[in-house]
Structure formats: structure tokens, C-alpha cells
Amino acid sequence: GWHDFKLFRAIPLDQLKLTVYDDFRAPERLFGRVETRDGRSLEGVLVYDLDEAMDFELLDGQNGNISYRIPFKYVREIEPKNYKYTWVKLSGGTELVLGGMYDVMATNDGILIFRTGGEVVYVRWRDVKRIELWTKGKQND
């Protein structure tokens, strides 16, 4: 309902920037760094929740009555806070606390990191402290 809105601003349709097919013309692998609760920092190509590996795939979560499906292309940081909720920072600076879906809860299957040199590391979700995502070769904006 309306109580879920922080702000409503009406704008002309020609000023509305919606995601379109061409925004994903050249899909990329997820690339980033996983910091673990025991202090390790692991960088490489990532597979999130063991099934999302490309920037056009979606991070699913809920906040109150609002459901989010955010392309990983727009996700910059992910930080599990407890078994039910995760903090997420988007490329535009927006911060969300999401829960209610497997991607952002203790039911997440963990992260695979394909490191330079061929080493593959699996990190359980409960061991993840923080994840940073960026386009390969370019760290966060």
C-alpha cells in the first residue's frame, strides 16, 4: 500500500529510464571480492547462490510488502546481516535491507569464486561477511 512509499514523484514518460534489452547486449560474468568472517579476501569470477553467474541475472528479495528483482549489473555490495536479512548497495548509491527470498537469507547456497590460476573456492553463505561486485577489470564506481 501507500505506506510502503518513501516518496512518489510523477515524471513524464519520456524522462523515465527503464531497463531495456540493449542494456544487456554484452552480458558479463559476475566479478568481485568475497570477504569471509574468518578474514579471507577472495577475488575472481563469482557464482552467487550457486546459480547466478551473469550480470543480467536477478537478485531476489523483499522489504515489507515490496518485492525486488534486481539485475546483478546494478548491485555493488552485499552484506548478510543475520539469517533472515541482507544489506544491499546498488550502483546508484541506494541501500536496501532485503529478506524473504533464498538469495538474501540463510537458505542461500553460498558463493563459488573462480580465482586467477584456476583455483575454485566455495564459501558457505553463513561464512560470507561481505561481497563486492564490479565489471571485470573495473572496481566499484
Predicted regions and their residues:
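Compositionally biased alpha-helical segments
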Residues: 1-141
